[in-house]
Amino acid sequence: GCISTGSFCTLSKGCCTKNCGWNFKCNPPNQ
């Protein structure tokens, strides 16, 4: 799954969602 990073962010390999005022570099989705 995703790793929460900040209040409204999740980020992990192959996973990213809402940015927290800055942009995350995201890998292609692995579903």
UniProtKB/Swiss-Prot annotation:
Residues bearing the modification 4-hydroxyproline: 28-29
Organ and tissue specificity: Confined to the epidermis and to the mucus layer.
Molecular function terms, GO-annotated: sodium channel regulator activity; toxin activity
Keywords annotated in UniProt: Disulfide bond, Hydroxylation, Ion channel impairing toxin, Knottin, Neurotoxin, Secreted, Toxin, Voltage-gated sodium channel impairing toxin
GO CC term (a single one): extracellular region
Site for Hydrophobic/aromatic residue important for potent activity, residues: 8
Record bears the keyword DNA damage: no
Domain of life: Eukaryota
Disulfide topology: 2-16, 9-20, 15-26
Entry keyword Secreted: yes
Protein location: Secreted
Signal peptide: none
Recorded family membership: Belongs to the nemertide family.
Domain notes: The presence of a 'disulfide through disulfide knot' structurally defines this protein as a knottin.
Note: Negative results: does not show effect on rat Nav1.8/SCN10A.
Role noted for this protein: Potent toxin, demonstrating strong inhibitory effects on insect sodium channels (Nav) and reduced activity on mammalian sodium channels. Potently inhibits inactivation of insect sodium channels of B.germanica (BgNav1) (EC(50)=11.1 nM). Also delays the inactivation of most mammalian Nav (human Nav1.1/SCN1A; EC(50)=92 nM, rat Nav1.2/SCN2A; EC(50)=134.2 nM, rat Nav1.3/SCN3A; EC(50)=12.9 nM, rat Nav1.4/SCN4A; EC(50)=14.6 nM, human Nav1.5/SCN5A; EC(50)=27.8 nM, mouse Nav1.6/SCN8A; EC(50)=123.6 nM, human Nav1.9/SCN9A; EC(50)=80.5 nM).
Protein name: Nemertide alpha-4
Protein source organism: Lineus sanguineus
